[in-house]
């Protein structure tokens, strides 16, 4: 069977040409899938009956299956559990912002990074998601809302830069004016600091925002909560991020989870300010740690968080304490997880 989801206009035209189908039908098919959210070939009534039958007999649109949906009490956040064709499961989140709808997608089934504060990594990494599976998360939310998706953040389960090729291709398709027409400037990739592919992404020349999961200001603390720190020293990570900024001129976002008695002291606030002041126009997201069933980590007091924020800001750095969306439905930062049959690997 020929998979049609995750194919560019040119790829679909090539498939149709091989089977003696008129070229213009490819654009009609894209319109059905990505704009009308019609996935049943028999309901694509612009196509002649013979073409609908050929598509039914030879092609598939393998969207993930929606298993469950949770909606936050204020109605602004929706989390969905999706099942892939191999029964692997991932979660994705839709957030209604003042500027439109933003989707947080997963890039892998599980995660190998082992960050102690994150539920996504508890079962280890099972596999990478395909281009169609990443794209499908956005398409499903479009179908649920019947609204244009405004922005995409690759901040769900997985380390996006470990699944580099599939993530990049999915974002390129989302950017394609014929498909979803989402600006690269409305896309963010979050990384734990997978150094080689930070450089690689910088050299793509795309104005995608990079968010670094920093979470500590020295190697010792970072290694204790993020095992990837044992592979890449903090200076290596920051050098790569500086290269990304210098190459793309895109504002860097630093994610810093606040964990009481771990990384939330005033000394660490000063250290964070000193690091970030060297990145022009950067922004720091302070994220109070979110609980989940796997961990017993606690957020600092509101007073502590505000003082921490003020110290970072005193270095001339833009900083906010993130407004959590979806924590009531386990859809906030660090709470997404995946269900799958077996553990593949953990990063050590």
Annotate the PLM regions.
Residues 1-88, 242-250, 258-348:
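Auxiliary Fe-S-binding modules of radical SAM enzymes
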Residues 70-72, 106-107, 120, 190, ...:
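Short linear Ser/Thr-Pro motifs
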Residues 85, 96-98, 193, 205:
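A generic beta-sheet turn/junction motif
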Residues 89-94:
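A short loop-to-beta-strand scaffold at the N-terminal edge of the catalytic core in hydrolase folds
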Residues 96-133:
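Canonical Radical SAM [4Fe-4S] cluster-binding loop centered on the CxxxCxxC motif
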Residues 122-151:
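Conserved alpha-helical substructure of the radical SAM core
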Residues 142-151, 156-316:
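Conserved AdoMet/S-adenosylmethionine-binding subsite of the radical SAM
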């Amino acid at each position: 069977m020929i998979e049609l989801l995750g194919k560019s206009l040119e790829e679909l035209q090539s498939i149709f040409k091989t089977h003696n189908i008129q070229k213009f039908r490819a654009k009609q098919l894209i319109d059905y899938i990505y704009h009308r959210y019609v996935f049943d070939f028999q309901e694509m009534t612009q196509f002649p009956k013979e073409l609908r039958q050929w598509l039914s007999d030879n092609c598939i649109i393998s969207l993930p299956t929606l298993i469950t949906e949770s909606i936050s009490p204020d109605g602004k956040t929706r989390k969905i559990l999706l099942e892939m064709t191999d029964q692997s499961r991932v979660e994705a989140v839709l957030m209604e912002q003042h500027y439109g709808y933003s989707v947080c997608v997963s890039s892998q089934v599980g995660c190998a990074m082992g960050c102690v504060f994150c539920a996504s990594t508890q079962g280890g990494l099972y596999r990478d998601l395909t281009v169609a599976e990443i794209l499908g998360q956005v398409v499903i939310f479009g179908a649920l809302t019947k609204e244009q998706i405004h922005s995409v953040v690759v901040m769900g389960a997985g380390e996006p830069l470990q699944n580099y090729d599939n993530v990049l291709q999915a974002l390129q398709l989302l950017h394609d004016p014929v498909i979803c027409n989402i600006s690269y400037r409305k896309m963010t990739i979050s990384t734990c600091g997978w150094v080689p592919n930070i450089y690689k992404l910088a050299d793509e020349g795309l104005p995608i925002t990079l968010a670094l999961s920093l979470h500590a200001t020295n190697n010792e603390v970072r290694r204790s909560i993020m095992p990837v720190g044992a592979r890449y020293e903090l200076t290596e990570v920051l050098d790569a991020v500086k290269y990304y900024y210098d190459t793309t001129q895109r504002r860097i976002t630093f994610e810093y989870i606040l964990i009481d008695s771990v990384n939330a002291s005033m000394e660490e606030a000063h250290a964070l300010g000193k690091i970030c002041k060297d990145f022009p126009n950067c922004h720091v997201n302070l994220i109070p740690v979110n609980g989940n069933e796997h961990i017993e980590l606690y957020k600092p007091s509101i007073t502590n968080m505000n003082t921490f924020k003020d110290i970072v800001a005193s270095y001339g750095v833009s900083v906010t304490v993130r407004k959590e969306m979806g924590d009531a439905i386990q859809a906030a930062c660090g709470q997404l997880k995946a269900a799958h049959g077996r553990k593949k690997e953990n990063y050590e």
